[in-house]
């Protein structure tokens, strides 16, 4: 093999290595992002941090090549419902790239109160479109009660999403049937109920109304729909 051919191969190899590194850092921008809808109690229990805050500004993040595509949102924390004690006053939430990485871009009005759930990584709060992020004004009174005090009591329970025929397999489960087409997408369980352990039933998890209805009216049903 001639020296020139060796040099050309070395250049090609170097280019491919650099390209692979770049793609690794930037990620696959063609990858579609999809998130399954979750009951707000599931969103609460699976999150590292839950807070009520106002979005103040959106900025691009400074940093190395892998970080430049991230953004951070400046927020004003109003109330921390769940999270580390040292994060009582979160000022920034970070989000991954918008294209294909489930990044969250706040397109709503600024200085409006939002309920925000997220993860804590390396002392940094991160959010995505898969997190429960919703205007506080759109959250029902029952959901507000849930985020404030009740959902935390049911984190030992498991809410099972029911898209078709389904049934529970243990006493710590509640069937979430809002996603069935027959329910006409009213999302009643989402908006008004919490899955909580009941002392009088030896810790068995059942649906409980967080609204004005009688608490025993919406107990868990052992459905086989």
Where are these regions (language model features)?
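Transition segments tied to proteolytic processing and entry into folded domains
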Residues: 2-225
